[in-house]
C-alpha cells in the first residue's frame, strides 16, 4: 500500500501514490530489488535518496542497478540543459565523477544498456554519441520533418510590402526594419527560427 511505501522508503504521500501507480501492487518488491527505479521515469526522485535506500538493502556502490541509473540520470540531467546526447567518453567521465566509480565499470554498464536498448548509440565523425531512446526518436523526427520542408519550393510573398503598409495603417503603428524582415522571411521561407528580442 501507499502507507507501506511511505514508511519504508521515507517519501511523501504524493510521491508514494505515484510509486504505487507506476509499479502497482508489486511496488515494494520492485523497489527493494532496484531502489534506483525511484530516480528514473516517471518519478525522478533524488539519486541520493535512492542511494540511501540501496544502502539500507546492503547494495554495493558498484552494483549494476546503480551504475545504469547513474548513466540514465546523467543523460536526463544534460537533456534538461538542452543536450539530446553526449559523446560516450564524456558520459562515462561525468557519470564516474557523479557516483565516484571508475569509468571502466560504467563502460560495461553502458554496453549492457545499449544491448537492452535502454540507451541508443549513433556515430558522428567516428565518435559514438549516447542517447535516451525518446530523445533520439524526437531528434530523428524533427530532422525528417525539416528535410521535407527544405525540399519544398519557396513561397513568393506577392504584394507583401503593400499588405504590410495596409496593416500598419489599420493598426496605427509601423513595424521596425527587423520586424519587417522577420515577417518577410516567415512568408517566404519554408522553415524559420525566430529568436526572442525586442518586438517579438
Summary of predicted features, one role per range:
Residues 1-200:
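Conserved ATP-binding/catalytic motifs of P-loop helicase motor domains
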Amino acid at each position: 500500500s501507499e502507507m507501506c511505501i511511505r514508511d519504508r522508503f521515507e517519501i511523501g504521500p504524493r510521491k508514494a501514490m505515484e510509486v504505487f501507480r507506476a509499479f502497482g501492487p508489486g511496488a515494494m518488491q520492485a523497489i527493494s530489488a532496484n531502489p534506483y527505479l525511484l530516480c528514473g521515469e516517471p518519478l525522478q526522485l533524488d539519486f541520493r535518496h535512492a542511494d540511501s535506500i540501496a544502502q539500507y538493502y546492503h547494495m554495493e556502490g558498484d552494483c549494476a542497478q546503480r551504475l545504469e541509473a547513474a548513466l540514465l540520470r546523467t543523460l536526463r540531467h544534460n537533456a534538461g540543459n538542452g543536450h539530446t546526447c553526449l559523446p560516450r567518453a564524456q558520459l562515462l567521465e561525468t557519470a564516474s565523477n557523479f557516483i565516484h566509480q571508475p569509468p571502466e565499470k560504467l563502460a560495461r554498464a553502458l554496453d549492457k544498456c545499449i544491448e537492452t536498448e535502454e540507451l541508443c548509440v549513433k556515430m558522428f565523425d567516428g565518435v559514438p554519441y549516447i542517447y535516451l531512446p525518446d530523445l533520439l526518436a524526437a531528434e530523428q523526427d524533427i530532422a525528417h520533418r525539416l528535410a521535407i520542408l527544405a525540399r519544398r519550393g519557396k513561397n513568393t510573398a506577392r504584394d507583401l510590402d503593400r499588405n504590410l503598409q495596409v496593416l500598419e495603417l489599420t493598426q496605427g503603428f509601423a513595424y521596425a526594419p527587423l520586424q519587417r524582415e522577420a515577417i518577410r522571411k516567415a512568408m517566404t521561407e519554408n522553415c524559420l527560427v525566430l529568436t526572442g528580442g525586442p518586438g517579438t
